[in-house]
Curated annotation (Swiss-Prot):
GO molecular function: DNA binding; DNA-directed RNA polymerase activity; ribonucleoside binding
Organism in which the protein naturally occurs: Sulfurovum sp. (strain NBC37-1)
Record carries keyword Nucleotidyltransferase: yes
HAMAP family, per the entry: RNApol_bact_RpoB
Domain of life: Bacteria
Enzymatic reactions: RNA(n) + a ribonucleoside 5'-triphosphate = RNA(n+1) + diphosphate
Subunit composition and interactions: The RNAP catalytic core consists of 2 alpha, 1 beta, 1 beta' and 1 omega subunit. When a sigma factor is associated with the core the holoenzyme is formed, which can initiate transcription.
EC id: 2.7.7.6
Protein name, as recorded: DNA-directed RNA polymerase subunit beta
Pfam families xrefs: RNA_pol_Rpb2_1, RNA_pol_Rpb2_2, RNA_pol_Rpb2_3, RNA_pol_Rpb2_45, RNA_pol_Rpb2_6, RNA_pol_Rpb2_7
Known role: DNA-dependent RNA polymerase catalyzes the transcription of DNA into RNA using the four ribonucleoside triphosphates as substrates.
Length: 1385
């Protein structure tokens, strides 16, 4: 399959070396699918949704006395009342309500036993859970009017994990441990200590010998021994100890001289027993061999030895054998004993050691508890470790242990955990068993012993098979579960405390859904994973929603996360982007999904590969997880393959279990789908990424997310082909929902008419204009289709911010030169030509929102008004009669935006007083000015005003005017749509009638038509509707019926439109819902134009960032031989040490694109006779440089009109795509340089703009894509003379937000001391800071023109003395009288 030349709504020459097999999946599908599964909004059957599952797990709820049961029937979802837009304007949460149907059963009970018999009555009732935030179409949530994103969490998968660590105490001994991690419940650890005792530990509490755990689970000592050890039977004959001859015991070297019954040595110690010899011995009839005494002395019994006389247990299981015991047995005449064979392969003494350790602890317990049964004691021991200091009964201890691991309410492994357990331990317990079983514990311990003996596999906790993703649906499900658990507790408490008759009881008396709502809202508003959406530009939004965080509840803590967790892991390949992660303390903890990766239903990340069989690449594409990838040999996408899909080379570099190895082509199982699959969506936007150092690529992908939307957008000349994909999935670009034809298009609306099985429809796409984002940037959507265009489904019909013809465009193509210029580009600074400022190349608009609310207070209501006490009239000129600033006003700091007065707390005036006041309007004395002022450092134009009034309060003129405007817009929309339907109706009818023959004669105007003839379409279109009815009478009945059917069909469509319109109007008329206590809310939107300034931060896409240091007149900039000056000068020293050479290649290719564009423009200017033919040939020649494209066919078959449109686009620069790891290579560059008539090193001669002299060296000049970042100098610069002071210390506050001062710190004090500037220093530390009296005195002196008096004691001194007094030290300040003065007197 060849790669397409199309990218968005333009052509782009793509240099890919591998064909694009599959589409990049929707970038936001993880979040969308996850939330979809949570609610299942549109589906009929919702019982598989996460929401339903959570509710079913929490019910039924019983009380302890068996009187009541609450059961959950089902739930319905109630659609939201407000649109997203309204919620954002009014500060509400865009959410659904849930109607839960709950049944309360009251039981008849048996009075004696208290058991329930039959239901006395069942009552059903609906309980509402309000405010479950609903995901908007933009994949975000609106909470309290603010758009937020829930970041996906990457956490440790439930299941079992085996680890090894170096011992901290016993030298460098390796200690092994196993952890069983549930999704919910207690963690269980098994670990070795330095003495080889195996311990269990629950929830990081004190450790207990592992045998205690098994005994508490009702295993006898003998069971435990048989589970973990093979046993040997030893016969005692003639004071000798004999054992059956088993060749498998001697698989290694023999540990002792093996003797037969007669004492002959068969195998010498330290020698091997060959299979052949063993066979021979068996044939010779060797059955018993002697077991040496010294070996027997170190063994332990596997079964109890019974005293032959008394019948009592003589020696218990696990008793160590010694001389006296053996003697005793011989004396007793015991014939055989069973011993634990801990010398067998794959065993060790750890369980025996644990038995020895547990004997100690149980012996002490026996004395205190006075219980003999050791299994009960074991349970009590566990209870005491978990709940120290609490009294305990055997029953409580048993049930406690059962609850810990075997109760589905307290413990949940989840299906994923069960799957991982079964996979690791080789069990086949069914998926739905999500609690632990005894089998799990035994097999875990067995595997741990295996690991210690070097046979099992240690797990890597950072392997992506052991980490999984919890997306929004699951996170929200967990929160809901927490809320339900709280509610369950509350319900059970209520059930027990209810006294009196139960007959009156209803479900809502018990169920309080507030707890659920609170838990969910807390998660959305203050949870660690719920973040304020980064909305600087479309890319930052898309990547924010694709982010994976290892932090958050149940995740890591960033202070404790080590290096390993943060590092790139081999399994990240094709799953997680290795480049994009923040710098700083979160590095590596916050990641991004790779472009092609998907997340499966278990939460594991999958990467796509093509299947390879016998060195033959097939068409089968599989998505596999990191675990499934183990032992698979994977070839890179760049592997050479012939046209039949056979791998050409014999030996290729492949990936196998995280290592890169050379392997034969036959060994290969899979091949990468595309080199692009490694990187994430932001890194994939960097051309020539393969030539950049990783650190710089990281900065580049992070800085692209900070690019501000500019006034005019401009797609990159050198892109990567990813631009169209990002805008395809961002909501900012408007995409057609259904196919059709553009009926009307203007700056704010696009109407597309089409027809499907339901009838003719008109899709109306309203466009956002000047919408303020979370980061105060401005989003505007611009239509890119024309009237009459035929639109396909999913086609981009309007560009969002930072988009150009359906491609992402976050910056500008600028001509740059790499050279020093009078020292102005020292330390990465950037020199900019004045032309860029003049042409508004980097001008952006930022919109700020200020709001003010009038509240109801105890002593009256605040009012928004124009008459404000003690304010001059000229300060109110820009306000309207309601006291709100007028639209279009240019506001500056300190201007009043909204006038508001608030009543002073005063005694209630008498009715007479009130009357007088009403007559004379003497209000001023009793109210205080609380107006909204324009803050410092904000100036701009008021672009929008929103006024919301609470129900029952009178709307002011401003609110009424806004309503009228909105209504007028809706009415005109409706009118337009009706006209379109009308037009379509006449077209259809005319088309139909013109094809039918007349049944009678008819006259239209002055022309007569005979029966049997046809009337042409144009004539029918010219007849008005009422006359047409008469004309139709002249056709046959069938035709008349069809005509009526068409009329009715369109009538129905018009009715539908009318209903929709009325619905919209009713929404417009409904009252504003405001938070309680607020009577009126006014929002003012101020737009500021920010031109590029000295101090603004700019960057390229390769991590090459800098600050604008100088804006130079165009005339002084260096210029080329044809007189064109460059636009930006960058420092060449920023390249070699940073190793981001990608920018140099980008500059070369950008120059080629622009030069070729100029050649095409020249063709347009000259317009020869066969101009189109030449243009087509030129475009084919350019596109043919990249081999893997369908350029020839596409361009040669394209219609002339289309070709001209695309040619016009290319005349402003031919667009190239250099995809990640597949950029333009040397031969392609050579061809392109030749086509563009550029010298082969891409450099050119420049002349100094100031002197006109030729530069000595040739300079690298070309086009680079430059971005203006969100760090604008206007928003950072800040100055204060006087302002607020901190309360306790009385020093000026800090920070721009608080209008604070600059801190004169310790080191600054040293500087003044060094200069000996004592007076200035004293002033700095007193009256300029916190000497309250001194400040006031200085102010008085300055106003009177006197000299500033001496300063007093700084407030800090008083604070210090107070703190000393609080410590109990009596510190007082005394003023000393100056002796010098007294002498003068």
């Amino acid at each position: 399959m060849l790669n397409s030349l199309h990218s968005g709504n333009r052509l782009r020459v793509d240099f890919s070396k591998t064909p694009r097999e599959i589409e990049i999946p929707n970038l936001l599908q993880l979040q969308q699918k996850s939330y979809e599964n949570f609610l299942m909004l549109g589906e009929r059957d919702r019982k598989h949704s996460t929401l339903e599952r959570v509710f079913r797990s929490a019910f039924p709820i019983h009380d302890q006395q068996n009187r009541l049961t609450l059961t959950y029937k089902n739930s319905e979802i109630i659609k939201p009342k407000y649109t997203v837009r309204e919620c954002m304007e009014r500060g509400l949460t865009y959410s659904v309500s849930l109607k839960m149907n709950i049944a309360l059963t009251i039981w008849n009970r048996d009075e004696k036993t208290g058991e329930k018999l039959d239901p006395k009555e069942i009552k059903e009732q609906a309980v509402f859970v309000r405010d479950i935030p609903l995901m908007t179409e933009r994949t975000s949530f609106v909470v309290n009017g603010v758009e937020r994103v829930i970041v996906n969490q990457l956490h440790r998968s439930p299941g079992v994990i085996f680890k090894e660590e170096e011992s901290t105490t016993a030298g460098h001994k390796l200690l092994y441990s196993a952890q069983i991690i549930p999704d919910r419940g207690s963690w269980l650890y098994f670990e070795y200590d330095a003495k080889d005792i195996l311990y269990a530990r629950i929830n990081k509490r004190r450790k207990i010998p592992v045998t205690i755990l098994f005994r508490a689970l009702d295993y006898t000592k003998e069971d435990i021994v048989k589970l973990f050890y093979p046993t040997k039977e030893i016969s005692i004959k003639d004071n000798r100890f004999l054992v059956k001859f088993d060749p498998s015991d001697f698989s290694g070297r023999a540990e002792y001289d093996v003797k037969d019954m007669d004492g002959n040595v068969i195998v010498n110690a330290g020698k091997r027993l060959t299979k052949k010899k063993a066979q021979q011995l068996i044939e010779n009839g060797l059955e018993w061999i002697e077991y040496p005494l010294e070996m027997l002395m170190e063994r332990h019994l596997a079964t109890a030895v019974i005293d032959q006389e008394s019948g009592e247990v003589l020696y218990d299981v696990v008793a160590p054998l010694d001389e006296t015991k053996l003697k005793k047995m011989i004396e007793q005449g015991i014939e055989s004993i069973e011993i634990i064979n801990d010398l067998a392969e794959g065993t060790d003494k750890s369980i025996i050691n644990a038995f020895i350790a547990d004997n100690e602890s149980l012996r002490l317990l026996k004395q205190t508890e006075e219980i003999d049964d050791e299994n009960v004691l074991s349970a009590i021991r566990i209870y005491k470790v978990m709940r120290p200091g609490e009294p305990v009964t055997p029953e409580a201890a048993k049930s406690f242990l059962r609850q810990l691991f075997f109760d589905p309410e307290r413990y949940d492994l989840t299906e994923v955990g069960r799957m991982k357990m079964n996979h690791k331990l080789g069990l086949d317990i069914p998926q739905y068993a999500t609690v632990l079983t005894a089998e799990d514990l035994i097999n875990t311990v067995k595997y741990l012993i295996k690991v210690k003996n070097g046979h099992g596999h240690i797990d890597d906790r950072d392997h992506l098979g052991n980490r999984r993703i919890r997306a929004i649906g699951e996170l929200l499900g967990n929160e809901l579960h927490n809320g339900l658990v709280k509610m369950q507790k509350a319900i059970k408490d209520k059930m027990t405390t209810i006294s009196g008759t139960l007959d009156e009881l209803m479900p809502h008396d018990l169920v309080n859904s507030k707890m659920i709502t609170n838990t969910i809202l807390e998660f959305f508003s203050s949870g660690q994973l719920s973040q304020f959406m980064d909305q600087t530009n479309p890319l930052s939004e898309v990547t924010h929603k694709r982010r994976l965080s290892a932090l958050g509840e149940g995740g890591l803590v960033k202070e404790r996360a080590g290096f390993e967790v943060r590092d790139v892991h081999p399994t990240h390949y094709g799953r997680i982007c290795p480049i994009e992660t923040p710098e700083g303390q979160n590095i590596g903890l916050i990641n991004t999904l790779a472009t092609y990766s998907k997340v499966n239903e278990h939460g594991f990340i999958e990467a796509p590969y093509k299947v390879v069989k016998d060195a033959q690449v097939t068409d089968e594409i599989v998505y596999i997880t990191a675990t499934q990838e183990e032992d698979k040999c994977i070839a890179p996408a760049s592997t050479k393959v012939d046209e039949n899909g056979k791998i050409v080379e014999d030996l290729i570099e492949t990936r196998l279990n995280g290592n890169i190895e050379l392997n034969e082509a036959k060994r290969v199982d899979l091949i990468d789908i595309s080199p692009l699959m490694i990187s994430g969506s932001a890194a994939a936007l960097i051309p020539f990424l393969e030539h950049d150092d990783a650190n710089r690529a990281l900065m580049g992908s992070n800085m692209q997310r900070q690019a501000v939307p500019l006034l005019k957008t401009d797609a990159p000349v050198v892109g990567t082909g990813m631009e169209a994909i990002v805008s395809r999935d961002a909501w900012e670009a408007v995409k057609a929902k259904r196919a059709g034809k553009v009926e009307k298009v203007d700056a704010k609306n696009i109407y597309i008419m089409g027809e499907d099985e339901t009838g003719v429809f008109i899709d109306h796409y309203p466009l956002e204009k000047n919408m303020r984002t979370n980061q105060n940037t401005t989003f505007t959507q611009t239509p890119i289709v024309k009237l009459g265009d035929v639109i396909e489904v999913g086609q981009v019909i309007a560009d969002g911010a930072n988009m150009d013809q359906g491609e992402l465009a976050i910056g500008k193509n600028i001509m740059v030169a790499f050279m020093p210029w009078y020292g102005y580009n020292y330390e990465d600074a950037i020199i900019v030509s004045e032309k860029i400022i003049r042409e508004d190349t980097f001008t952006s608009v930022h919109t700020y929102e200020k709001e003010v609310e009038a509240r109801e207070l105890k002593h009256g209501t605040e009012e928004i008004t124009r008459d404000i006490p003690n304010i001059r009239e000229d300060e109110l000129l820009h306000l309207d009669e309601s006291g709100i600033v007028q639209l279009g006003t240019y506001v500056k700091p300190g201007m009043i935006l909204v006038g508001k007065v608030s009543p002073k707390g005063e005694i209630k005036p008498t009715p007479e007083e009130r009357l007088l006041r009403a007559i004379f309007g003497e209000k001023a004395g009793h109210v205080v000015n609380k107006s909204l002022y324009c803050p410092a450092s904000m100036e701009g134009v008021v672009v929008d005003i929103k006024v919301f009034t609470k129900k029952g309060y009178e709307k002011d003129a401003r609110a009424i005017q806004a309503y009228e405007e909105e209504k007028a817009i809706l009415d005109s929309d409706h009118h337009d749509q009706l006209l379109m339907i009308d037009r379509e109706e006449i077209l259809r009818i005319a088309h139909y009638l013109s094809g039918q023959e007349l049944a009678k004669d008819v006259t239209i105007g002055d022309k007569e038509y005979k029966a049997g003839s046809k009337i042409d379409e144009e004539t029918i279109k010219g007849v008005n509707r009422f006359a047409l009815r008469g004309v139709v009478q002249s056709y046959s009945d069938d035709v008349q019926n069809e005509y009526e059917a068409l009329k009715n069909y369109f009538l129905k469509q018009k009715k539908r439109l009318k209903n929709e319109h009325e619905e919209k109007l009713s929404i417009l008329e409904k009252d504003d819902i405001l938070p309680s206590g607020v009577t009126k809310l006014v929002k003012i939107y101020i737009a500021t134009k920010r031109k590029l300034k000295v101090g603004d931060k700019m960057a390229g896409r390769h991590g090459n960032k800098g600050i604008v240091s100088n804006i130079v007149p165009e005339i002084d900039m260096p210029y080329m031989e044809d007189g064109r000056p460059v636009e930006i000068i960058l420092n060449p020293l920023g390249v070699p040490s940073r190793m981001n050479i990608g920018q140099i290649l980008e500059v070369h290719l950008g120059l080629v694109g622009m030069r070729l564009g100029e050649q095409i423009q020249e063709m347009f200017d000259n317009k020869t006779a066969d101009f189109i033919k030449e243009l087509r040939a030129k475009m084919i020649e350019i596109a043919d440089v990249a081999k893997l494209m369908n350029a020839k066919e596409v361009l040669s078959q394209m219609s002339d009109e289309e070709l001209l449109a695309y040619g016009r686009d290319w005349s402003r620069g031919v667009k190239f795509a250099a995809p990640v790891f597949e950029g333009t290579n040397q031969t392609e560059f050579d061809k392109l340089f030749e086509l563009a008539k550029i010298e082969s090193d891409g450099k050119m001669t420049l002349y100094d703009g100031k002197t006109g002299e030729k530069m000595i060296e040739r300079v690298n000049v070309g086009y680079m894509y430059m971005l203006k970042l969100h760090h604008l100098v206007d928003e950072k610069v800040h100055a204060r003379s006087t302002g607020p002071y901190s309360l306790v210390t009385q020093q000026p506050v800090g920070g721009k937000a608080l209008f604070g001062g600059q801190r004169f710190g310790e080191m600054e004090v040293w500087a003044l001391e060094a200069y000996g500037a004592s007076h200035i220093l004293k002033e700095m530390l007193t009256i300029k800071s916190d000497d309250v009296e001194g400040r006031a005195r200085a102010y008085r002196a300055l106003t009177k023109g006197e000299s500033v008096p001496a300063s007093g004691v700084p407030e800090t001194m008083f604070v210090l003395t107070k703190e000393l007094q609080a410590l109990g030290l009596d510190a007082e300040l005394y003023e000393s009288k100056k002796e010098v003065e007294s002498e003068d007197e």
